Design a protein with these regions (language model features):
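HDAC/HDAC-like amidohydrolase catalytic core signature
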Residues: 1-190, 195-232
């Protein structure tokens, strides 16, 4: 099987997360990708570094203001006296009746849904490499391959068009699906994960050209809690 992976993804190494009010080491570590990469090589799959596809496929899914935030927030955060080493929000507004603030602290709350996705100086480049890997696999299918595998981290299915969350910054599967729409009238995303793919669902919820199907644990008592119910 043809597979794609960009070593740039290893550079994102989040340290902090908060579970049930308790600070814990972040579990979305580069070792997860190393295990999968090594398994691909050990089983004889062809592993390629994707060629650059630029920012256009990402911009086709994510809002410009959100991308500007992801690209610049770490630098702005470090200018705050006494700020933490990683960008971690301490306020989460109700977006239905609010305005995008100018301050770095306020924007962290606006664009980050939880504390599981801290941003470091390498996060933007790694997230972009992850998304580019997904586009590379999608392009391989457009070029005639029957299948292609994209090894992507940071992951993506909790990322909304303008909101990070659940370890996710750029929605890799949504970006790949949108890229496939260049040649295909209909695309299906099958999301098999213990967590509901709330970001992916949100991006395509009002569209009939991309079907999202998520198999996940009951959100009544499991992340992401607010999405993933049967009536949706």
């Amino acid at each position: 099987m043809l597979a794609f992976f960009d070593p740039e993804q290893f550079k994102h190494e989040p340290k902090f997360s908060l579970f049930s009010g308790v600070p814990k080491p972040n579990s979305e570590v580069s070792e997860r990708a190393k295990v999968l990469r090594d398994a691909l090589l050990q089983h004889g799959h062809e592993l390629k570094i994707p060629k650059p596809h630029g920012i256009i496929p990402v911009e086709a899914v994510h809002h410009q203001d959100y991308l500007h935030f992801l690209k610049n927030i770490y630098r702005r955060w470090q200018e705050i006296p006494g700020a933490s080493a990683e960008v971690i929000p301490n306020i989460h507004p109700n977006r239905t009746a609010g305005n995008i603030p100018e301050s770095a602290v306020g924007q962290a709350g606006w664009y980050m849904a939880d504390t599981a996705c801290p941003i470091s100086n390498e996060t933007w480049n790694s997230a972009l490499a992850s998304a580019n890997t997904a586009v590379g696999a999608a392009q391989a299918v457009l070029d005639g391959h029957n299948s292609a595998y994209a090894l992507c981290r940071p992951p993506g299915h909790h990322a909304f068009a303008d909101l990070a969350g659940g370890f996710c910054f750029l929605n890799n599967s949504a970006i790949a699906a949108q890229h496939l729409r260049l040649n295909f009238q209909k695309v299906v995303i099958l999301d098999v994960d213990v967590h509901h793919g709330n970001g992916t669902q949100s991006i395509f919820y009002q569209r009939d050209d991309v079907l999202t199907v998520s198999l996940h644990a009951d959100p009544v008592s499991f992340y992401p809690f607010f999405w993933g119910y049967s009536h949706e």
